[in-house]
Design a protein with these regions (language model features):
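PP2C/PPM-type serine/threonine phosphatase catalytic domain
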Residues: 1-275
């Protein structure tokens, strides 16, 4: 079993809002991994005095502990408990009902001698490499599948870059984030109930050779710059390591016209070879 990971801020002048960790028991018969991508809020008040890096460190640490030690709890239950624990840590000082309260996308996986379990929430990704080398992406596509009116606003921002257009798009997206009627998409913030909306699953341990967890700053290699498919991305990381993928993304970002939004995003890659 081998773990290899890298995480890098998009801007060296800003704190990294991604999180990555893994735990392997002394027995060597299982493990768990967690990757989070903290959501950078727009400029202005977000109701929290701590900030996104604090939040992802708290949430990620709690989630890894629970996933690694509470085999009696499903991963969705682990996420719900981790969200509740993190919320309790700043409930008395911060406005957890603020729509921009710190939040994050989530990938968590856990394995033992019998099963491999996974959970994905929002637009970070988990790639599962089967015993025969086939690669299957586990994705939560709800953020990518926004309503037509919101997609139209997004396209307008990409065309114009105008501040007013961007503000309108941000407001529309915020209205869909963790929408109670299920019409939008979900991120882990202060409501433990969000865990029920995650993409979850499991498969026999014998059917899985490796796992690759990535934030969207790393999946740009496939999803933004179209440098290869998911199988090609996994092959690159297998052969050259997580750092090579991040370096390729940074090169592509520099060579292409600036993206609307962030030129460089925090990027995290965690490879877990189970055999």
């Amino acid at each position: 079993m081998r773990i290899d990971m890298v995480t890098e801020p998009g801007n060296p002048q800003r704190l990294n809002e991604d999180y990555a960790s893994a735990a392997l028991p002394a027995s060597g018969t299982g493990g768990a991994l967690v990757v989070l991508d903290g959501v950078t809020p727009p400029e202005g008040d977000d109701g929290c005095s701590h900030g996104v890096p604090w939040f992802v460190a708290r949430l990620g640490g709690a989630l890894l502990e629970l996933a690694g030690t509470r085999r009696d709890m499903a991963l969705a239950e682990c996420l719900a408990a981790a969200v509740a624990r993190t919320a309790d840590a700043h409930r008395e000082t911060c406005d957890l009902f603020h729509p921009r309260t710190p939040q994050a996308t989530v990938v968590v996986a856990r394995w033992d001698e019998e099963r491999v379990e996974h959970l994905v929430l929002s637009d970070s990704a988990l790639l599962v490499e089967a015993a025969d080398g086939a690669v299957r992406p586990v994705l939560d596509r709800r953020l990518a599948e926004l309503p037509p009116t919101v997609r139209a606003l997004r396209d307008r921002v990409r065309r114009t870059g105008e501040a007013a257009d961007r503000a309108a798009y941000v407001r529309a997206v915020e209205g869909l984030r963790n929408a109670p009627d299920g019409s939008g998409f979900y991120t882990a913030a202060a409501d433990p109930g969000v865990a029920a909306h995650a993409v979850t699953g499991s498969e026999p341990r014998a059917d899985v050779r490796a796992l690759l967890a990535l934030t969207d700053g790393a999946t740009r290699w496939t999803e933004t710059f179209h440098l290869g498919d998911w199988t090609g991305l996994f092959s690159l990381v297998r052969k050259e390591g997580p750092r090579a993928l991040v370096n390729r993304v940074r090169t592509a970002e520099s060579e292409h016209a600036p993206l609307r939004g962030k030129l460089h995003d925090d990027a995290t890659v965690l490879l877990a070879e189970l055999e």
